[in-house]
């Protein structure tokens, strides 16, 4: 697992989890704003993403275990956690399974929804286990020798724009320098083409929503108002009745799914207000 830090090593730790098909260096503008406020910001590339190794197994449970391993290796005791999209959902679910792993959780468009999220498309599982395992094995056979299509950095940036249409070309081009590699025949994104989100066994998004009222630590959710393909489609009015009374939910007008990239200073400001001074939570 490739890990990253911003800020002083002896500062109060703050764990940040990126979203699906992203990598930790997408935090290169956002994370320093948190570090400048006195936090030691810690993140990692999920398995198969960025500079972390490709794996034989990709599943929701594997990502959850990786989160716990990284946190326990880097931080002693509870700490605040921030997660975007899939990363937010991972933080929420891990905290529900292991209460007080975190002192509080911030989910940037990553709170549970009745709708299946697009970056965890196969997390909604209702079929029999035999069919699930067969499907997973078939996918591994199809993708065992797959490699990503090469191109120039400009071409890779344009391809990523299909997934991130609201983000500037300059930013997407920058990401090619930290999230892609140069081979003899061109540049390729480092993300494993065999990635498959989800896992085995039944799962419904509603189950996560039903567990929210008993969330064990302070919870802060941020949602944008502009829907896009990678967004989770969570509507604030649908979500509010399921939140704990102490939870905070901010709706950022005019922002899309990648709120912390579109508006890093505003997003960091809202989160820092929620967190308080380093060490208070």
Residue ranges of model-derived segments:
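Conserved HGGG/HGGXW glycine-rich cap/lid loop of the alpha/beta-hydrolase fold
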Residues: 4-53
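Flexible "cap/lid" loop of the alpha/beta hydrolase fold
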Residues: 96, 104-149
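Conserved loop-alpha-helix segment in the C-terminal half of the alpha/beta-hydrolase fold
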Residues: 213-255
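Alpha/beta-hydrolase
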Residues: 146-227
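Active-site loop/oxyanion-hole signature of alpha/beta-hydrolase fold enzymes
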Residues: 36, 42, 46-82, 86, ...
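Post-His helix in hydrolase/transferase enzymes
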Residues: 261-273
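Alpha/beta-hydrolase fold catalytic core
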Residues: 1-15, 36-39, 76-77, 112, ...
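Catalytic histidine-centered segment of alpha/beta-hydrolase-like enzymes
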Residues: 252-264
């Amino acid at each position: 697992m490739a890990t990253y830090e911003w800020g002083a090593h002896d500062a109060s730790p703050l764990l940040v989890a990126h979203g699906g098909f992203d990598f930790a260096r997408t935090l290169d503008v956002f994370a320093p704003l948190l570090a400048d406020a006195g936090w030691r910001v810690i993140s990692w590339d999920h398995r198969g993403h960025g500079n972390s190794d490709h794996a034989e197994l990709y599943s929701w449970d594997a990502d959850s275990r990786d989160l716990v391993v990284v946190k326990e290796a880097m931080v002693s005791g509870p700490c605040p956690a921030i997660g975007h999209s899939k990363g937010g959902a991972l933080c929420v679910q891990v905290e529900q399974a292991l209460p007080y792993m975190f002192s509080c959780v911030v989910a940037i468009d990553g709170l549970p929804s009745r709708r299946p999220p697009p970056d965890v498309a196969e997390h909604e599982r209702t079929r029999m286990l035999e069919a699930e395992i067969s499907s997973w094995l078939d996918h591994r056979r199809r993708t065992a020798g797959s490699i990503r299509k090469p191109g120039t950095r400009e071409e890779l940036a344009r391809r990523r724009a299909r997934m991130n249409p609201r983000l500037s070309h300059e930013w997407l081009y920058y990401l090619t320098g930290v999230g892609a590699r140069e081979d003899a025949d061109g540049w390729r994104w480092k993300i494993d083409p065999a990635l498959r989100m989800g896992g085995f066994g039944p799962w419904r998004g509603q189950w996560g929503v039903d567990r929210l009222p008993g969330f064990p630590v302070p919870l802060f959710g941020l949602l944008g108002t502009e829907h896009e393909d990678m967004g989770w489609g969570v509507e604030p009015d649908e979500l509010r009745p399921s939140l704990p009374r102490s939870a905070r939910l901010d709706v950022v007008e005019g922002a899309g799914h990648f709120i912390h990239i579109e508006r890093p200073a505003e997003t960091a400001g809202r989160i820092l207000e929620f967190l308080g001074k380093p060490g208070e939570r």
